[in-house]
Regions:
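A glycine-rich helix N-cap at a beta->alpha junction
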Residues: 118-144, 214-220, 224
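Glycine/serine-rich anion-binding loops at beta->alpha junctions
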Residues: 72-95, 99-111
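Alpha-helix C-terminal capping segments
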Residues: 45, 89-101, 182-187, 222-223, ...
Length: 421
């Protein structure tokens, strides 16, 4: 049966909704075996229409539990970048404004860490919840963070395995289907997806990010979801930290009032979301409301409520003990000049590689500079937090070459290039 579908695609045919339900049924029964891998390789080779992407997403949604709540829900997703904990800022920020927001976390592809990785740095934080628990949290705290694991979209986890094993992580149609099935299952009605492009992203080119955003717009609208697609560059990391616990600290600092790029981007995302929900709301008023809830502490208080409701240890957050590095070393500038580039791709790969082998959320890198900053010889460029001496020995050379100093100032780049609705 799967072989027949492969032949149909090879002949240029579009597959029906029934065909995609058959594919997903096979995925659930057989996992990521060679035959189903050949099918997805065929999709990669021969292409998919937007309608087919929607059909695959719908079939994967129906492979597991689908949430249905009688309430308007926001959700936010990122296609994956380095040093981007905006979701952790955005969830309590939106909730503090009286809106309801759900976040389905998932493990990330390739070199980035996902929201699931960051939240698990909070001791005892529970993301495997029943429908009743999810609804209760949405009604009491306006927010809920849930896992893509368990019985939510199990077919998508098979697709993840295939994409990683066979190098299909860059296929825009499969990426969209993977994202969309989870948003369909979460019950969200307004979804912001930050589509990233650049060296430190799965998607490398701006035009590919634009194409992906257009496919997302189609499948979301067909499912009755209001889409907000931001296209952003990974040239500059949003936050200063790279690593699970350190990115969590980054987000907490913003929720406690710190002014920085991470705050600017998070506030911009929040503005796009609440003005989509309320088209008559003036954007300047939206900015004022959102910034006020950071500065008056309501967003931070809401974060603690959300963590507490999901069993997380709020004391360790309040005492700033969530990030407990073992050893650290500073990398300094060898001359005066301007920060010309930061290779966050390599830095992200290093941190993830060590985290996966050590199973330690305290591994990380703190960037002390941004692109365009003027620095003097001897100033700290970044700090590397590690556990074993072998980690330092293995990566010192690679890390030391990740920040380039130039004689001329590089023009500051605001990362968000475009917004599509």
């Amino acid at each position: 049966m799967i072989q027949d579908l492969i032949l149909l695609k090879a002949k240029g045919n579009k597959l029906s909704q029934e065909n995609y339900y058959e594919v997903v049924d096979y995925m659930i029964k057989h996992g990521a075996d060679k035959l189903i891998a050949k099918f997805f390789i065929a999709l990669d080779s021969f292409g998919m229409s937007k309608e087919e992407v929607y059909r695959l997403a719908l079939a994967m949604r129906d492979s597991g539990r689908v949430l249905k709540f009688n309430m308007p829900l926001f959700e936010k997703h990122s296609t994956g970048g380095v040093g981007d904990p905006t979701s952790i800022v955005l969830i309590p920020l939106i909730a503090s404004l009286g809106y309801k927001i759900i976040k389905m976390t998932a493990r990330s592809l390739v070199f980035t860490n996902g929201s699931a990785d960051r939240f698990k740095a909070i001791p005892h934080f529970k993301v495997m919840l029943t429908n009743e628990e999810i609804e209760h949290n949405l009604n009491t705290t306006n927010a809920c963070v849930i896992s893509h694991g368990g019985d939510m979209c199990p077919a998508d986890r098979v697709l993840y395995d295939i994409m990683e094993k066979y190098g299909l992580e860059h296929n825009l149609n499969l990426l969209v289907a993977s994202i969309a099935c989870k948003k369909f299952a979460s019950g969200a009605k307004i979804v912001l997806v930050d589509v990233k492009y650049g060296d430190a992203s799965v998607i490398k080119r701006y035009l590919d990010a634009l194409s992906m955003a257009k496919i997302l717009k189609y499948v979301f609208k067909k499912n009755g979801i209001k889409p907000i697609l931001t296209i952003s560059s990974t040239v500059q990391t949003f936050g200063d930290g790279i690593g699970n616990a350190i990115e969590l600290v980054d987000a907490l600092n913003v929720l406690q009032g710190r002014k920085c790029l991470l705050r600017d981007v998070s506030v911009r995302f929040a503005v796009e979301m609440i003005t989509t929900a309320n088209p008559t709301l003036d954007r300047s008023d939206a900015y004022d409301m959102i910034n006020s809830n950071i500065d008056n502490g309501l967003a931070y208080k809401k974060f603690m409520e959300i963590v507490s409701a999901q069993g997380g240890d709020t004391k360790i957050l309040q005492e700033a003990k969530v990030f407990k590095p073992y050893r650290s070393v500073n990398f300094v500038a060898d001359r005066d000049g301007y920060v010309g580039s930061i290779n966050s791709l390599v830095l992200g790969e290093i941190v993830r590689r060590i985290c996966e082998t050590s199973h330690d959320d305290n591994i990380g890198i703190a960037l002390r500079v941004k692109i365009g900053d003027f620095i003097k010889k001897g100033e700290i460029l970044l700090s590397f937090y590690y556990k074993d001496e072998s980690d330092f020995d293995n990566y010192i050379t690679a890390i030391s070459g990740c920040i380039r100093i130039t004689n001329e100032k590089i023009k500051e780049i605001y990362p968000i290039r475009k917004v599509i609705r």
